[in-house]
Curated annotation (Swiss-Prot):
Residues holding substrate: 82, 88, 120, 151
General function of this protein: Catalyzes the reversible oxidation of malate to oxaloacetate.
The species this protein was found in: Pelagibacter ubique (strain HTCC1062)
InterPro entries (alphabetical): L-lactate/malate_DH, Lactate/malate_DH_C, Lactate/malate_DH_N, Lactate_DH/Glyco_Ohase_4_C, Malate_DH_type3, NAD(P)-bd_dom_sf
Transmembrane helix among keywords: no
BP terms from Gene Ontology: lactate metabolic process; tricarboxylic acid cycle
Binding, NAD(+): 8-13, 33, 95, 118-120
Residues at the catalytic site: 175
EC class name: oxidoreductase
UniProt cross-references to HAMAP family, sorted A to Z: Malate_dehydrog_3 (MF_00487)
The protein, known as: Malate dehydrogenase
Reaction(s) catalysed by this chain's protein: (S)-malate + NAD(+) = oxaloacetate + NADH + H(+)
Length: 320
């Protein structure tokens, strides 16, 4: 019996619950929210869709952390979403307080769970959660790289008019304006993307525009929605991570993880390719970055560190 608890029953939380149900990733799903009515209402609504879609999963909604006991996976989406004109970093003070409460609830009731954080600003929130909760770093990860990579793949597929599943691509670094798309490691139908640039299928200038659109991918959606931020693609990305852990898939996925010397970086969470299996983060893959990529990656790391310093001033417990 596999149990997944979702902390936050907003747009991402509700979508996560529905996806987990339709894909039967777990046997039980608990939707937790401080607004218990929203959690209970969504849980009941999704449960009522099970006979239509033909899945067999138990759903419940709660505002009591005791109900997440014995969870195999916990996905955190609790927090305030962005509004137009806001960066992910603008959410820092509000969401830091929320993450601290969530960390206490999980530490007390489900300390053995594999925890996936989706709350923004992502890299600092997952670092703060790990620090507040004391859970082992290999069991605490952030969802960012899968989402950023999926945006990069989509924009390339639209530009090159090829199916998105034919594109292999990866984005590293922090989940923000300094993220690092990696065209050099990108393949289209097995062919290096940079070969297509040489052949004139896509210009270097157009490729850079796609890189920038990837960095702005979340903001573009926030601008359209006006109230709220992306939720379908973030939820799908979170489910992929949960599946890799529960099914011991040993899958290579770009995730925000705790770096301890890899890529020349220590004591920081940032997006890199990792293997996820039954032990959580089982291996951090170190790909050979060139000088330009290294410079961009370190610039992204510096941005994460600067935000971490700001967070530490808001809550001195993070400096301990």
């Amino acid at each position: 019996m596999k149990k997944i608890s979702l902390i936050g029953a907003g747009q991402i939380g509700g979508t996560l619950a529905h996806l987990i149900g339709t894909k039967e990733v777990a046997d039980e799903v608990v939707l937790f929210d401080v607004a218990s009515g929203i959690a209970k209402g969504k849980a009941l609504d999704i449960a009522q869709s099970s006979s239509v879609d033909g899945f067999n999963v138990k759903f419940s909604g709660t505002d009591n952390y005791e109900d997440i006991k014995d969870s195999d996976v916990i996905i955190i989406t609790a927090g305030v979403p962005r509004k137009p004109g806001m960066s992910r970093d603008d959410l820092l003070g509000i969401n830091l307080k929320i993450i601290k409460q969530v960390a206490e609830g999980i530490k007390k009731n489900a300390p053995n769970a594999f925890v996936i954080c989706i709350t923004n600003p992502l890299d600092v929130m997952v670092m703060a959660f790990q620090k507040f909760s004391g859970l082992p770093a290999n069991k605490v990860v952030g969802m960012a790289g899968i989402l950023d990579s999926s945006r990069f793949k989509l924009f390339l597929s639209l530009e090159l008019n090829v199916p998105v599943k034919e594109i292999e691509a990866m984005v590293m670094g922090g989940h923000g304006d300094t993220m690092v798309p990696l065209p050099r490691f990108t393949k289209v139908s097995g062919k290096p993307l940079l070969d297509l640039v040489k052949e004139g299928k896509i210009s270097p200038e157009r490729l850079e525009e796609i890189n920038q659109r990837t960095r702005d991918g979340g903001a573009e959606i926030v601008k359209y929605l006006e109230k709220g931020s992306a939720f379908y693609a973030p939820a799908a990305s979170g489910v992929q991570m949960a599946e890799a852990y529960l099914k011991d898939e040993k899958k290579l996925l770009p995730c925000a993880v705790h770096l301890n010397g890899e890529y020349g970086v220590s004591n920081v969470y940032a997006g890199v390719p990792v293997i996820i299996g039954k032990d959580g983060v089982e291996k951090i893959e170190q790909i050979d970055l060139d000088e330009k990529e290294k410079k961009e990656f370190m610039h992204s790391i510096d941005a994460v560190k600067a935000l971490w310093e700001a967070a530490s001033k808001i809550d001195p417990d993070l400096s301990k």
